[in-house]
């Protein structure tokens, strides 16, 4: 079986590296056909149109936060859902054409997000260069190979792909930087619950005082931990926003399902973007186990309904 996965190209991007990691971890039993595109929006549109089975897109960076083009594209239209996530460590190589004199570098290119992650190095080593933004880091490397710019910051693999010379390796202003990528397909049955999951929703609220507080209270009352909340303009009127929320838990967890059901009653619009296994970095722990404790409490009540009256155990 062959599946097509759209990703921010060309070959050599961190997104491509995430794609192959998904192939290993999430899609091991299929043949993957990569489909390079020019933006996260194009990758998601390829899924909606059926031109791709999945899209691999960056969603959050540990240094710069949310990847807003991805959030906007996820909310732009229905029909897509997240089925997995993975983390990629981010370091850059500085590259140029082999015959080029590094002392004469005048133009420098990379993706705008990447620029922020190598800004200190560039300021120290290339203080006079003009920045030329690229649609991706690998596209910047391609521009160097084609002679349109003098140097680029990109994954080191891009230098091999475009026959460039690496003049500096392992460049990162913040050590330990990493980016979370998600695998997005057409809407369907969510991934099975694992007990360590993430769920995402997008919603709009009526323009009344207290509506956001009320919406978030539905999660707090049920002990559902939010791992991220972002607001993005609806692009219809000034001052109108949609909210993106990630939470720890699965739609099959009773507290999560109850919170989302209550949220539905409060919202003008609510989109469920899926529940999927969380990718934890080494040493990272789930911030609390409230959802698990509430599930334990529900099971305790069910035993009473069956006439099996258990002794209540005090919380640890």
Task: Briefly describe each language-model feature range.
Residues 1-316:
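Domain-level signature for soluble enzymes in the chorismate/prephenate branch of the shikimate pathway
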């Amino acid at each position: 079986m062959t599946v097509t996965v759209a990703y921010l190209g060309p070959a050599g991007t961190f997104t491509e590296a995430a794609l192959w990691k998904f192939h290993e971890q999430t899609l091991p039993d299929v043949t993957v056909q990569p489909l390079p595109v020019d933006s996260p929006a194009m990758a998601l549109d390829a899924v909606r149109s059926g031109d791709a089975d999945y899209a691999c897109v960056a969603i959050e960076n540990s240094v710069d936060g949310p990847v807003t083009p991805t959030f906007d594209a996820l909310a732009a239209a229905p029909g897509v859902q997240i089925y997995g996530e993975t983390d990629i460590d981010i370091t850059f190589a500085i590259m140029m054409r082999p015959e080029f004199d590094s002392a004469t570098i005048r133009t420098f290119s990379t993706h705008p997000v990447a620029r922020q992650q190598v800004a200190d190095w560039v300021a120290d080593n290339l203080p006079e260069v003009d920045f030329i933004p690229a649609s991706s880091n690998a596209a910047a490397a391609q521009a160097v190979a084609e002679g349109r710019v003098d140097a680029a910051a990109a994954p080191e693999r891009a230098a091999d792909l475009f026959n460039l010379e690496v003049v500096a390796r392992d460049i990162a202003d913040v050590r330990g930087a990493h980016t979370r990528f998600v695998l997005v397909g057409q809407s369907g049955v969510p991934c099975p619950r694992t007990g360590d999951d993430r769920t995402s929703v997008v919603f709009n609220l009526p323009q009344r005082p207290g509506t956001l507080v009320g919406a978030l209270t539905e999660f707090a009352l049920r002990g559902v931990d939010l791992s991220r909340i972002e607001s993005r303009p609806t692009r219809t009127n000034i001052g109108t926003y949609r909210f993106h929320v990630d939470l720890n838990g699965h739609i099959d967890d009773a507290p999560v399902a109850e919170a989302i059901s209550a949220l539905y009653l409060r919202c003008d619009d609510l989109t469920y973007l899926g529940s999927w296994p969380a990718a934890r970095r080494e040493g990272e722990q789930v911030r609390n186990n409230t959802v698990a404790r509430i599930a334990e409490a529900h099971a305790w009540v069910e035993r009473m309904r069956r006439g099996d009256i258990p002794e209540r155990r005090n919380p640890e």
